[in-house]
From Swiss-Prot:
It catalyses: fluoride(in) = fluoride(out). The lineage of its organism: Bacteria, Pseudomonadati, Thermodesulfobacteriota, Desulfovibrionia, Desulfovibrionales. InterPro entries: FluC. The keyword Transport applies. This is Fluoride-specific ion channel FluC.
């Protein structure tokens, strides 16, 4: 139960961090390009990689705390960091077809389903 509560709190903090940082960046650089989201996503990748790398090579972080940080905070901050981490795993193990299907499939299917959802939602 404690892990679930910590996961929820970390998720709330990640959401607030995403909202705050994306808004700050977008106000600093107004325009049609979603720079706030772009910055959040790439910084999320950096942070996810850093935490994973530190846990892998430097410190022994309790598995529950790793879940709270990576799934809770980073999952709410950006799911793009998880997507790129899993993509890199496929690339590093030479699973190029799986990587292409995973990365390309999410982008293309995601865009198609977003378009379908928008169209359906506009009809309701």
């Amino acid at each position: 139960m404690q892990k679930i509560v910590l996961l929820g709190l970390a998720g709330a903090l990640g959401s607030l961090a995403r909202y705050g940082l994306a808004g700050l960046v977008q106000r600093a650089a107004p325009g049609s390009f979603p720079l706030g989201t772009f910055i959040v996503n790439v910084l999320g990748c950096l942070a996810f990689g850093f935490v994973w790398g530190v846990c892998e090579n430097r410190i022994s972080l309790h598995p529950d705390l790793r879940v709270v940080l990576l799934t809770g905070f980073m999952g709410a901050f950006t799911t793009f960091s998880t997507f790129t981490f899993e993509s890199l795993g496929l690339m590093e193990t030479g699973q190029w077809l799986a990587f292409a299907l995973y990365a390309g499939g999410q982008l293309l299917l995601g865009l198609a389903l977003l378009w379908l959802g928008l169209g359906t939602g506009r009809l309701v």
